[in-house]
């Protein structure tokens, strides 16, 4: 029992003396993180297919509107990709960007500058129909996509 009391007395003496004996130490470090650029494009209102009527064929074109939600975290903006599907159209006119675009069979990429955030993108498309097109339902002749810069 005497040994236990001595051990407790020693521990108490060290515990109360420790702050007086302890030196002050400081440390600093830098933390950095790399956040990969990310873009998501969601169709809010876009037809799943293109319905071409006899009046559209006679007129030579048909029009649709589409609305998308674009969310990105890049400080410089994002890249909007417009990828036409061949065969149904001669050209596609795209309105709703900084300028009206007219595209043929080749894809177009458009830099969309702006701060990070979530934005609504409203586009209008005029599809100039190929002369061989007949009335009917077709897959949408344009794929809209977005990716980081």
Question: Where do the PLM segments sit?
Answer:
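N-terminal small/polar-rich segments of proteins
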Residues: 21-88, 106-149
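Short, surface-exposed beta-strand/strand-loop-strand elements in extracellular ectodomains
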Residues: 89-101
